[in-house]
């Protein structure tokens, strides 16, 4: 159960962080057809509550489950499938946050590197990303906590206890008919709370950076 929670959380950190940084850079630095429409669409997608998408997501995961090889990793009732859904739901917010940080990075160094013949990918990796490390770290913390505490999506798209994560296990400990062992409930709850406590202790400045990146970025 702890392993499933870590798989979901770490997958979200990697998936949301890498995709959001690439998409945010493209939306911040490049003018292409449909750019504003894409930005508006990400906001619309983020406005949808995840509960309204559960039926559609169910059919998508069942379809993926039928694909040989891939279905065993990313299909219905797999930790990879849950991570895929959680990544998709978190991407709109991640893209907007990263775009805000990229908007605050000066063009001068980037233009010099492009004039010298560096590719866009190399400029993004070697010049731009090091300047937005606080934003990447803050986004990683948010996505980790989202995956670590996820309940609705894992509870909907998993069967049995093999793929249960910590929130599901914590809910199962509090049965309606059997007596609840509150010592175990308290221990599991405290264990699940540890990343949250670390988050509040060590990431206060990163939260302020996220706020400044989100409100100062232009379109």
Feature map (PLM): residue ranges:
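A hydrophobic, multi-pass inner-membrane permease signature
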Residues: 1-219
